[in-house]
Amino acid sequence: MDINSIIIIFFSFLIGSIPSAYIIGKKLKSIDLTKKGSRNTGVSNLTQNTNLYASLPVIFFDLFIKGFLPIFLCSDSIFSLDINTKILCGMVSLIGHNWSFFLNFKGGRGIATLVGIILAIDYNLFVILSGIIAIGYLFSPIKDSALWWI
C-alpha cells in the first residue's frame, strides 16, 4: 500500500465522519438529533424533526461527498488506485458516517452514503439495487428506510 492509498483512506474516514444531518439540525432548528426521535444523526431523523427541505442538502452531501467522492478520487483519472482500495475507501467512509468521532462514535445508518458508494463502484449494480429497494419499500408494511427487508 502506497502513501496515496493511506492518505485517501484517511481522507475518506474524515469526510465520512462529518455529521452533516447533525450540523443542519443544530443550525436550522437548534435541535440535537442525538436526543430527538430515533437519536441517530441521519437524514431520516432529521426529516422527522424538521422537514424534507432541510434534508435535501444532507442527502446530497452524504450521497455524493461522503459516498461517491472518496471512490471517485481512487479512480483511474485521479489516483489510479485498485478496486480493493476503492472498496476500502467506501467502507471507512461508511464507518466514519455510522460512528463519527465528532459525535463520540454516534452517527446515522449510512443509507445515503452507501448508495453513493455503490453508485461510484458500479452504476449497473446501483440501478439493480435501486429497483429491488424500491419494490421492497412499496410492498413492505414498515416504511422506515432502513427496515423494509425485516
Language model: regions and residue ranges:
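Interfacial segments of multi-pass membrane proteins
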Residues: 47-51, 74, 92, 111-142
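Hydrophobic alpha-helical transmembrane segments
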Residues: 6-11, 56-60, 86-91, 115, ...
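Multi-pass membrane catalytic core of lipid/isoprenoid biosynthesis enzymes
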Residues: 48-75, 89
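Helix-coil boundary and interhelical linker segments in multi-pass alpha-helical membrane proteins
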Residues: 1-8, 67-88, 119-126
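N-terminal signal-anchor transmembrane alpha helix
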Residues: 2-28
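Short, non-helical or kinked segments that cap or interrupt transmembrane helices
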Residues: 31-40, 102-115, 142-150
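Cytosolic, membrane-interface loops and tails of multi-pass inner-membrane proteins
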Residues: 22-55, 107
